Amino acid sequence: MAPPEVFANTLQLPYPGIELWVERLKNNKPNESPLVAEVDGQIVGCAGLHREIEVRRAHAAQLGITVDLAWQGQGIGRALMTALLDTADNWFGLLRIELQVFADNARAIKLYESCGFVQEAVLKSHGLRNGDYVDTLVMARLHPKPPRLRPEIQP
């Protein structure tokens, strides 16, 4: 989907082929919600929610997003984020969305902050990129209008 420079800014392997993404979509698990952005039949971005399956974490999901370098800064990332957050808020009723991002990825951090994410932690030397250890930020967003548990299932 994207050149190695794009995946260098993620915690994924730098050379995922299209076959890997096709396989991931074919073997999609019930707790995963993938999304792709296309322009004229070309995949220019992908994103997804990975909902937690543990009972005490069922209110949360991990978010991941990647946009092709040539399409960054053109609203693709914002469109993917908007769609995922709408799904999380209005369809899954999730309270908490979490993500990790390299601390020097200013463009992504700006997008996440504009979508309501806040920094919760810094993981020192957490990721390996081009032979160097780099810090990772843990960011999260809480539902703007948290859903309530039904009275019969509240603790």
PLM feature spans:
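Conserved GNAT acetyl-CoA-binding A-motif
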Residues: 81, 88-100
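Residue-level preference for beta-strand/loop junctions
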Residues: 59, 93, 133-135
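Conserved active-site alpha-helix within GNAT-family acetyltransferase domains
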Residues: 74, 78-79, 90, 103-121
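Acetyl-CoA-dependent GNAT
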Residues: 10-70, 81-82, 87, 142-146, ...
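Short hydrophobic/aromatic beta-strand or adjacent loop that forms the aromatic wall/cage
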Residues: 32, 134-138
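Conserved beta-strand segments that form the floor/walls of ligand-binding pockets within enzyme
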Residues: 36, 48, 62-66, 75, ...
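Helix-loop element at the rim of GNAT/NAT acetyltransferase active sites that forms part
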Residues: 1-12
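Conserved catalytic-core motifs of GNAT/GCN5-like acyltransferases
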Residues: 96-101, 113, 118-134
